[in-house]
Regions:
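Surface-exposed amphipathic alpha-helical segments
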Residues: 435-456
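Membrane-embedded alpha-helical segments of integral membrane proteins
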Residues: 220-254
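Internal/C-terminal transmembrane anchor helices
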Residues: 261-295
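N-terminal pre-first-transmembrane soluble regions of secretory-pathway and organelle membrane proteins
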Residues: 1-10, 228-236
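Membrane-protein extramembrane domains
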Residues: 2-127, 145-154
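Cytoplasmic membrane-interface regions of multi-pass membrane proteins
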Residues: 180-204, 252-268
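Core alpha-helical transmembrane segments of integral membrane proteins
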Residues: 120-193, 204-223
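Short, solvent-exposed recognition patches
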Residues: 235-242, 298-423, 429
Length: 456
C-alpha cells in the first residue's frame, strides 16, 4: 500500500478555516499533510487519529527562501514547545498540528490574526489574482465581443473556444476570489475589534466547476486535433504540450534545487526568473528546428488534405477534380461544425483559363438549436449589403427563392440592384445553413444533387 497520496485541492490560500477543517478530516482518515504546491498537495500515511491543526501566516516569508529565517525558527521552536508541530509551509503559510486533546491555541488576538493574514495575502495571493483578473477581463471581453461579431468562426473552432472559455473562467474565478476575500476582510476587521474571530469563506464548489469546464474544453480541443488527419498539426501540438510540461518542471526544479543548495532568496529569484524568460525562447527555437528537420526529411507529411469533400464538380458535370485547386477546411465543436470547399476543374485551372468551372460552398452545421438564427443572420449579411454604406442601386441583396428544387426550408439568391442575378445561394435546412457559389446557372437536376450531397 502506498504511503503517499497526491491530490488536487480546491481551498483558497487565505481560507485557514477551511484548511484546518480539511486537514483534520484527512488525519481522521489516516493522512497527514506533508507538502503543498501550486499543482498538488502531498499527504503521508499515518494511523487515523484526531489531530488539531492551526494554519498561520508569516508575511516576510518567500517561496524562494532556502529555509526558515531566524525569527521563523524561533517561532517554530516555541510552537513545538507547546505541542504544535510544523508539518509544512507554502509561501507565507505555515501548517501546524497538535496531538493534545485541548491544545493552547496559537492565535489569540483576532486583530493581529486578521492583519497578519492580510499582509501575507498582499505578498502573493492578491497580486496574482489581480493580474489574472486583468488578463481574464481583457481576453474574456475580446472573446465575448468576437462571439457577437463572428459567432460561426469562433464557436466552430475548438482552439478559439477552448482559450476563450479558459479566459472567461479565469475572470470569473478571479472576481469571485477577490470579492470573497475583501468582503471577509472587511467583516473580520470590524469583528476583530470586539475580540471575535470570523471564519474565512470557501469557494471550493466554484473552483471545482471551473476546473471541470476547462478540462472539458481542453479534452474537446485535443480530441479534435487527434481525430484530424493533419500529421503536422498533431506533431506541433504534441511538442507544445511537452514544451509546457518541461517548462514547468525545469523552472520548478531550478527553484527547488537552489533552495536545497541554500542559495539566497535574491539569487534564487533572479535565476528562476531568468529561466522563465530564457527557457521558452530556447525551447521554441528547438521545436521549430525539430519540426523543419522532420518536414524536410519526409518524416512529416505537409501535403495535408481533409477528408473527401461531400460535393465535387464531378458530381455536377463532366469535370476533373482529382488534381484541381481544392480548398477543403473543416473544424467543429459541440456547438457548430464549419466546412469550406473551393474547387476548380484542373483541366482548365492548370492552364489558367478564366472559363474553368468553379464551385465554392460553406456548410455550417448547427448542433445547438439556439444558435441557428444567429448563424443564419451572420451568413445572410456577409453577402447582403442592405445595411451597408453602398448607395441604393449598387448593392448586392438576397432575394427569397422557391426552396422546393433544393429540398430546403428556405432559399435566398444574391441579386444586384443593377438588375442581374449572381450565382450565389443561401440554403437553409433544419440543421444546416449552406452558402454555395457557382459560376454558372445551376439546373434543377444540379440543385437536387446539391441537396442530396450536402444535406443527406
Amino acid at each position: 500500500m502506498s504511503t503517499k497520496k497526491r491530490r488536487m485541492e480546491y481551498i483558497s490560500f487565505y481560507n485557514h478555516t477551511g484548511l484546518e477543517d480539511h486537514f483534520t478530516k484527512m488525519a481522521k482518515k489516516g493522512w497527514l499533510i506533508e507538502s503543498i504546491s501550486n499543482f498538488y498537495w502531498t499527504y503521508r500515511k499515518i494511523e487515523p487519529k484526531d489531530l488539531h491543526f492551526c494554519v498561520t501566516y508569516y508575511p516576510r516569508a518567500s517561496d524562494f527562501d532556502p529555509g526558515p529565517s531566524e525569527e521563523q525558527q524561533t517561532f517554530h521552536d516555541f510552537c513545538a514547545h507547546t505541542g504544535w508541530q510544523l508539518t509544512c509551509t507554502w509561501h507565507q503559510m505555515q501548517v501546524f498540528y497538535n496531538e493534545k486533546e485541548n491544545p493552547v491555541p496559537l492565535e489569540t488576538d483576532p486583530v493581529m490574526e486578521v492583519e497578519t493574514l492580510h499582509k501575507a495575502c498582499k505578498k502573493n495571493f492578491l497580486p496574482s489574482y489581480f493580474l489574472l483578473l486583468a488578463l481574464g477581463l481583457l481576453m474574456g471581453a475580446y472573446f465575448i465581443a468576437r462571439i457577437f461579431a463572428d459567432p460561426i468562426g469562433l464557436l466552430s473552432d475548438p482552439s478559439h473556444l477552448m482559450t476563450g472559455t479558459a479566459y472567461v473562467c479565469m475572470a470569473i474565478i478571479s472576481i469571485t476570489e477577490l470579492l470573497s476575500y475583501f468582503l471577509w476582510y472587511a467583516k473580520a476587521k470590524r469583528a476583530a475589534q470586539n475580540g471575535i474571530f470570523v471564519d474565512t469563506p470557501s469557494t471550493a464548489s466554484l473552483q471545482r466547476v471551473i476546473v471541470l469546464v476547462i478540462i472539458a474544453a481542453f479534452a474537446a480541443w485535443l480530441a479534435n486535433i487527434l481525430l484530424s488527419g493533419n500529421t503536422l498539426l498533431k506533431w506541433i501540438v504534441f511538442l507544445m504540450l511537452g514544451y509546457m510540461v518541461a517548462i514547468f518542471a525545469i523552472v520548478n526544479g531550478i527553484k527547488q534545487g537552489l533552495k536545497k543548495l541554500k542559495a539566497s532568496r535574491g539569487l534564487n529569484r533572479a535565476l528562476t526568473l531568468a529561466a522563465c524568460f530564457i527557457l521558452p525562447m530556447v525551447m521554441t527555437a528547438l521545436i521549430v528546428n525539430i519540426t523543419l528537420t522532420a518536414t524536410r526529411s519526409g518524416v512529416l507529411d505537409t501535403d495535408f488534405k481533409e477528408d473527401v469533400a461531400p460535393l465535387n464538380l464531378s458530381d455536377l458535370m463532366d469535370a476533373n477534380n482529382e488534381d484541381g485547386l481544392t480548398e477543403n477546411r473543416f473544424h467543429e465543436t459541440i456547438l457548430l461544425g464549419y466546412r469550406v470547399v473551393h474547387q476548380r476543374d484542373s483541366k482548365f485551372s492548370l492552364e489558367g483559363t478564366s472559363s474553368a468551372p468553379d464551385l465554392k460552398y460553406t456548410i455550417v452545421t448547427v448542433k445547438a438549436p439556439f444558435l441557428y438564427d444567429w448563424c443564419k443572420e451572420q451568413m445572410y449579411y456577409e453577402q447582403d449589403e442592405t445595411h451597408s454604406d453602398w448607395p441604393v442601386g449598387n448593392r448586392m441583396i438576397y432575394k427569397e427563392q422557391d426552396p422546393a428544387p433544393w429540398g430546403a426550408d428556405a432559399v435566398y439568391r444574391l441579386y444586384s440592384e443593377e438588375g442581374w442575378w449572381a450565382y450565389t445561394y443561401l440554403l437553409c435546412y433544419e440543421e444546416q445553413i449552406i452558402e454555395i457559389r457557382f459560376d454558372w446557372e445551376p439546373t434543377a437536376e444540379q440543385m437536387a444533387i446539391v441537396s442530396q450531397k450536402l444535406n443527406p
